[in-house]
Curated annotation (Swiss-Prot):
Pathway: Porphyrin-containing compound metabolism; protoporphyrin-IX biosynthesis; 5-aminolevulinate from L-glutamyl-tRNA(Glu): step 2/2. Its main location: cytoplasm. GO terms for molecular function: glutamate-1-semialdehyde 2,1-aminomutase activity; pyridoxal phosphate binding; transaminase activity. Keywords: Cytoplasm, Isomerase, Porphyrin biosynthesis, Pyridoxal phosphate. The modification N6-(pyridoxal phosphate)lysine is found at residue 268. InterPro entries: 4pyrrol_synth_GluAld_NH2Trfase (IPR004639), Aminotrans_3 (IPR005814), Aminotrans_3_PPA_site (IPR049704), PyrdxlP-dep_Trfase (IPR015424), PyrdxlP-dep_Trfase_major (IPR015421), PyrdxlP-dep_Trfase_small (IPR015422). This is Glutamate-1-semialdehyde 2,1-aminomutase 1. PANTHER family: GLUTAMATE-1-SEMIALDEHYDE 2,1-AMINOMUTASE, GLUTAMATE-1-SEMIALDEHYDE 2,1-AMINOMUTASE 2. Homodimer. Belongs to the class-III pyridoxal-phosphate-dependent aminotransferase family. HemL subfamily. The gene is hemL1.
């Protein structure tokens, strides 16, 4: 497949953009390097690169593009609002409308506030939780990504009773000392952490369904136990639903799982492809936020009319009858086909799937936590990723990321993907990896 224009643009980008990309995951470091594909346009389940190559898209911009690229309802909403103005710095009717829709869809959101990204949303929920509880420490779960604010770029210590260590240059040891990281789905480790730090813990930060070391569901009773134990210690429970909200049903993963947090962070899908974040929760907690309370948060672009219009339109599309049933049906077809293709090529894999999101791990063991995901074979995934790319199938360039289906995918797309996967699994089986 010819990608000479992408190669030229990547060379050019490295002279003016740090690393040639505006987010590290785009640099293909997770698959052993290479030239990122520069895209020209998207249409439905496909996008087209600058050399004219077509790809079936399972990246979906790391999750937001659940409706497919350039959905006509969302495109029209953005175009109509652009003609009226995209930024005023004042309240608008659209903010009220969108906030009402979110609170209707996710009942735990008694009040909401809009921001510009998932990172901002998570960062602010932590600040508000600290203001509400008067405590400082945070407990989070290993392998779960919560954006790039300092407090959540912290790696686990040597055990649940030890404090974290910085996971990025520029994160101070003092900041890391405020975070305790425990394994997901390990309630005993969580109990141990609370035994040591519960009296100092402001909040527990949870992905109710993990999306950042693959799609990993909670073990039965795990989230309920986290809620009960956290509340007994006087800590709040924050759900990071930046990936999961509106991915598995019209609402949050919390509604799918029937577990209610105190606060929730949102992003990705709710923006319809434009930058957005939101956070919300119980009224008494949210009233800690300025101008009502002492916890400060502001933003020039927060609640901008362009993002509000796109978000309202996106949720309108997702309210259509049968949307999530279609995603589940296509996801099941893809999962079954991938298992058969891998078995035929004699390549062991394990797939975690929920509705229209799945992760293919190159391992023969089930993956229920970050350690299991880490043990999956990254070399094999790298070969598979590059083979699939040459077949015209675009995945996320990391063994930890999910495949995201959109409502624009068809059964023919799935079947084409399975055929390409079989050829790619054969490349893996041939041993073209170290």
């Amino acid at each position: 497949m010819n990608r000479k224009t992408s190669e030229s643009l990547y060379q050019e980008a490295q002279h003016v953009i740090v690393g040639g990309v505006n987010s590290p995951s785009r640099a293909y470091k997770g698959v052993g390097g290479g030239t990122p594909v520069f895209m020209e346009r998207g249409e439905g389940a496909y996008f087209y690169d600058v050399d004219g190559n077509r790809y079936i898209d399972y990246l979906a911009a790391y999750g937001p593009i659940i409706t497919g690229h350039a959905h006509p309802v969302i495109t029209k909403a953005i175009q109509d609002q652009a003609a009226k103005g995209v930024l005023f710095g004042t309240p608008t009717r659209l903010e009220n409308e969108f906030a009402q829709e979110l609170t209707n869809a996710i009942p735990s959101l008694e009040k909401v506030r809009f921001v510009n990204s998932g990172t901002e949303a998570v960062m602010t929920t932590i600040r508000v939780a600290r203001a509400y509880t008067g405590k400082e420490k945070i407990i989070k779960f290993a392998g779960c990504y919560h954006g790039h604010s300092d407090l959540v770029l912290v790696a686990a210590g040597s055990g649940p009773s030890t404090l974290g260590t910085p996971d990025s240059a520029g994160v101070t040891a003092a900041t890391a000392s405020e975070v305790i990281t425990v394994p997901f789905n390990d309630i005993e480790a969580f109990k141990e952490a609370l035994a040591h730090w519960g009296s100092e813990t402001a909040a527990v930060l949870v992905e109710p369904i993990v999306g950042n070391f693959g799609i990993v569901e909670p073990e039965p009773g795990f989230l309920e136990a986290v809620n009960d134990l956290a509340h007994s210690a006087g800590a709040l429970v924050i759900y990071d639903e930046v990936i999961t909200a509106f991915r598995f049903m019209y609402g949050g993963a919390q509604d799918y799982l029937n577990v209610k947090p105190d606060m929730t962070a949102l992003g990705k899908i709710i923006g319809g492809g434009l930058p957005i974040g939101a956070y919300g929760g119980r009224m008494d907690i949210m009233e800690q936020v300025a101008p009502l309370g002492p916890a400060y948060q502001a933003g020039t672009m927060a609640g901008n009319p362009a993002s509000m219009s796109a978000g309202i339109a996106c949720l309108e599309v997702l309210r259509t009858e049968g949307v999530y049933e279609k995603l589940d049906e296509l996801g099941a077809r893809l999962e079954e086909g991938l298992y058969l293709a891998a078995a035929k090529a004699n390549v062991p894999i394990s797939i975690n799937r929920l509705k229209g999101a799945l992760t293919v791990y190159f391992t023969d063991e089930p993956v229920i936590d970050y350690e299991g995901a880490k043990r999956s074979n990254g070399d094999q995934f790298s070969v598979f990723f590059k083979a699939m790319l040459n077949e015209g199938i675009h995945l996320a360039p990391s063994k930890y990321e999910a495949w995201f289906l959109t409502i624009a995918h068809t059964k023919n797309d799935i079947d084409e993907t399975i055929e390409a996967a079989y050829r790619s699994f054969k490349t893996v089986a041939a041993g073209f990896y170290s």
